Swiss-Prot record:
Root EC class: lyase
Membrane topology annotation: Multi-pass membrane protein
Glycosylation sites: 164
Protein name, per record: Terpene cyclase adrI
A GO-annotated cellular component: membrane
Organism, as annotated: Penicillium roqueforti
Location in the cell: Membrane
Amino acid sequence: MEESSLLSAILDHRDALASVAEFLRILAGICWTLNYFSMLRTSRKDKIPSTGIFPLCNDIGWEFIYAFIYPTASAHWEGGVRVWFLVHCIVIIFIIKYAHNEWDHFPLIQRNLYFLYGVVTIGFAIGQYSFAREVGPDLGFFYGGVLCQTLASLGPIAQILSRNSTRGASLLTWLLRAIATFGGFIKLTIYYLTGNAAGPWFESPMCKFYIGLTLVLDFTYPICYYVIQRQELANAQKEKKEKSK
């Protein structure tokens, strides 16, 4: 009975829910784009990469496949994936420009950054293409995007913890990504409830795991940021006191 009432309420407000989903789709697209420009700003300000090699290269590989090889699978984004691909091409140039500042301890990597980023990007693109051939472009777009999202959420945590510094980190970049992510989750939930799901959602154990993992990771990042920032401030005050003696 309750299920029937819920379904009836959803059908009664189908048009309103569709408008909300469309707004969230546009909001997510804008926030993802601004997120990439925030990466550029942070990299330029701190002179080190603001994102890891795997998240960035996987994003570019996924975008290339679904912008140019299987564009119909990303048609609902109305060209947004192509825009992200072009923006990411600019981002990777900036990232590589400053990446050498992180590899003084490993000259072999430092001398071959363009080659390294190129090989990893091509590798991810081949992987995304192979997966699309295996499961079909529509499902490939969905689960390939899941990998992009997971790396985008996990990468910054690994980066800030390994550096033990907030240099190259940004709460603005995190906030834009979080808004895009949570807005996207709500949008996909509306699609699912109204029977317009572009891929599996609540009926999929893998999707439930993905939703839970992403939420945990995105709530973890600002905690890590503030803990390390407090540590930096404490160290700065300690150094200031020692110098004043």
